[in-house]
Amino acid sequence: MNTQL
């Protein structure tokens, strides 16, 4: 899982 803000 990759997350970016």
Curated annotation (Swiss-Prot):
It comes from the Viruses. Keywords: DNA-binding, Repressor, Transcription, Transcription regulation. The keyword Transcription regulation applies. GO terms for molecular function: DNA binding. This protein allows the phage to reside inactively in the chromosome of its host bacterium. This lysogenic state is maintained by binding of regulatory protein C2 to the OR and OL operators, preventing transcription of proteins necessary for lytic development. This is Repressor protein C2. It comes from Enterobacteria phage P21 (Bacteriophage 21).
